[in-house]
A protein has these predicted regions:
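Core of compact, soluble alpha-helical bundle domains
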Residues: 1-132
Length: 132
């Protein structure tokens, strides 16, 4: 089925709103987002444009989301929580096919971001910003 029939940009925006509702209520993610984001309307529009591009092919987002995350105090466990919040939001709002696609994209993003932000593997198998 074509993505146009699966969802529209309003559905994608509802997905983004639901994600941030979940993430901002999370004990670990909430403080990170609150400290980093000063203009929520602008940020949610950017994130919605990203997902509309990724899931619908809307061509509303260009560039990479990596750079703004470089200075944030993100640790390995945050990725698990971020993925869980996205998964929940997708299941709540998106048609199943798009929810699955969003999670495939999110897992790829998490792996890429983790590789860049946490390049050092500790003896216990976890990843870190700095060598031991």
């Amino acid at each position: 089925m074509s993505t146009e029939r699966l969802a529209d940009e309003a559905t994608i925006f509802a997905f983004v709103q639901r994600f941030y509702q979940i993430a901002r209520a999370d004990d670990e993610l909430g403080p990170l987002f609150e400290a980093a984001i000063t203009d929520w309307d602008r940020h949610m529009a950017i994130f919605a444009n990203f997902w509309a591009t990724a899931l619908l092919g809307a061509k509303k987002y260009e560039g990479t989301g990596y750079a703004p995350h470089i200075g944030l105090p993100i640790e390995e466990h945050h990725f698990t929580r971020w993925l869980a919040a996205l998964d929940c939001a997708g299941k709540d709002v998106l048609p199943p096919e798009l929810a699955e696609r969003s999670m495939a994209r999110a897992r790829h993003m998490a792996m890429s971001f983790k590789t860049g932000l946490l390049p050092f593997k500790r003896a216990d198998g976890t990843w870190s910003r700095t060598p031991e």
